[in-house]
């Protein structure tokens, strides 16, 4: 059984349970935002939306 990681949107306070793969991608996107690497952000958002659309809307939209 795959464990889930509770991840919270820092702006809304809403949370989602992510798989380890989704969580790694979420962290990569947030770091790319911080680094102003918008190509990586765009690609990460696209992939995350395909993996978990509900969590995308809660955490990244």
What are these model-derived regions, one by one?
Residues 31-61:
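Short, charge-rich amphipathic interface segments used for partner binding and complex assembly
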Residues 1-34:
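N-terminal acidic leader/helix
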